[in-house]
Amino acid sequence: MSLILSNVILHKLVKNEQDELEVCLRNQLLENEEFTEALVSELHRVFNSKAGKGFGIFKTESEFGHWLGSVRKNETPFLEFSNKSAEKLKSELIKYPFAEEGILVIAEYQSLATEYLFVAVLPSNESMKVTDELNISATDYLDIAKMDIAARIDLSTWETDSDSNRYLTFIKGRVGRKVSDFFLDFLQADVGMDTKVQNQVLMQAVEDFCADERLEKEEKQQYRKQVYDYCNGQLQAGEELTVKELSGELPTSESGSNFYQFAEEQGYELEESFPVDRTALRKLTKFVGAGGGLSLNFDAMLLGERVFYDPETDTLTIKGTPPNLKDQLTRRLGSSES
């Protein structure tokens, strides 16, 4: 991956003897050399591969946004911007119970004609290494794969499209809303495009289109499968789905309208493109549910053929039990009768 580096800096978040978080500031930018480019390239790659990212936009009063704008206009040196950002990050981080030590990296770079600003707190872990004398000693390393406090601003979009609701991307993190809340507070940003909602609206639009066109059951299943195949292909490739491109993959109705026109006319307010949500996608081809000690998962095409649901009695009937399940049930019933 070829990147063009503009500015890269590292600062360190450490805890003092009183277990209070402090910032150790680096006094100059990193040199634009091989290791610096390798670091930023890996950060860019890992960030792209992270699932569950959220989108945001700067609030009007965002200090971080104003500082960044000043840097982009060459009114403020990048080093000064990074120092102020590091201090602000610390002041926000100490409000949360997950405040930990780490390496703050702030990088301004270009990839594929798009300019970015990347901000992340990287875990610094200890490991072992073998020296040239074949002795064992301790060494520290950056655990980039485990980063969950990170955000990236698409500078090109931010500066050219004031109506964009997704130029800021952040990792939501595995510890729930707290990490994303903290980073949004630090950046003084609001949540922008909701990927999950966009996917849910898309799936509902697909169902409504099938109903509006009065497709037969088999036609509906085929239509859903084509939607699934396209979206899953984009997901596997790490690409976003494009509504117009998806529509082009689907057959035009007998009335001559296509899915894209339908979605536009019915006012679903879908973005032109957005990331695929795996959970929403799965519901196109499967019914999944769990609760009360019961877990069910079956292909949607089986509903009405081998699986029947009666809403009045809230009863699900399955005809043709899977062989391995049938064997378990038979053995259990047999042992209870003996």
From Swiss-Prot:
Positions of region (Disordered): 319-338
Species this protein is from: Aliivibrio salmonicida (strain LFI1238) (Vibrio salmonicida (strain LFI1238))
InterPro entries the UniProt entry points to: Nucleoid_associated_NdpA
Zinc-finger listed as a keyword: no
GO molecular function: double-stranded DNA binding; single-stranded RNA binding
Lineage, top ranks: Bacteria, Pseudomonadati, Pseudomonadota, Gammaproteobacteria, Vibrionales
Keyword check for Cytoplasm: yes
Family assignment from sequence similarity: Belongs to the YejK family.
HAMAP family: NdpA
Domain of life of the native organism: Bacteria
UniProt entry keywords in alphabetical sequence: Cytoplasm
Gene Ontology CC, one term: cytoplasm
Pfam assignment, any one: NA37
Location in or out of the cell: Cytoplasm, Nucleoid
NCBIfam families xref list: PRK00378.1
Protein name: Nucleoid-associated protein VSAL_I1059
